[in-house]
């Protein structure tokens, strides 16, 4: 039986999820590992992600393929 967390993982990131890039996005000067927040879903395959500095100032907003995003978790979850 698939849990809700596994279902969500298979569908990709949700709105307001914190994500990390799995590949560089050179067109937007973003490198693998940079962290952002999903701010909009642009169809089934793409999410709009906002990248901010430590003070919360956005320095990039880029459409990202959902397969290029890793959802980050800040509390323990069962694997």
Where are these regions (language model features)?
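Basic/aromatic-rich interaction segments and small domains that mediate binding to polyanionic partners
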Residues: 2-7, 13-78
């Amino acid at each position: 039986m698939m849990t809700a967390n596994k279902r969500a993982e298979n569908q990709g990131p949700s709105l307001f999820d914190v994500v990390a890039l799995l590949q560089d996005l050179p067109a937007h000067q973003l490198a693998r590992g940079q962290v952002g927040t999903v701010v909009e879903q642009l169809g089934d395959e793409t999410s709009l992600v906002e990248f901010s500095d430590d003070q919360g100032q956005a320095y990039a907003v880029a459409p990202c393929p959902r397969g290029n995003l890793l959802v980050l978790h800040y509390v323990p979850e069962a694997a």
